[in-house]
Design a protein with these regions (language model features):
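Short, charged/polar connector segments at secondary-structure boundaries
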Residues: 1-75, 79-86
Length: 86
């Protein structure tokens, strides 16, 4: 596992999530004041990056117009990726 600064556009987010808008607003305030404190988790498979958590952090960062996100990147097998896509 490694922690990296990644372009938001490079992360595939295949699952639709329901956002708590109040939580996104609080995160926007905190991120603009203190920066991103907790990385999201990303799976890397065959050169592609897949994000399955951190939807509120990602939404806050996108709405702030920031181009990158801090992420813990873990290599994944095809089986691991399939499990997350269910």
């Amino acid at each position: 596992m490694r922690v990296a600064t990644l372009p938001l556009a490079s992360i595939r987010r295949p699952l639709e999530r329901t956002l708590d808008e109040a939580k996104v607003a609080r995160l926007m305030e905190a991120i603009s004041r203190d920066g991103q404190q907790e990385p999201i988790d990303v799976l890397e498979f065959e050169g592609q990056l897949w994000g399955f958590n951190g939807c509120h952090r990602v939404a806050a960062i996108e709405r702030l117009g920031l181009p990158t996100v801090q992420a813990r990147v873990r290599r994944a097998t095809a089986d691991t990726l399939r499990m997350h896509l269910r």
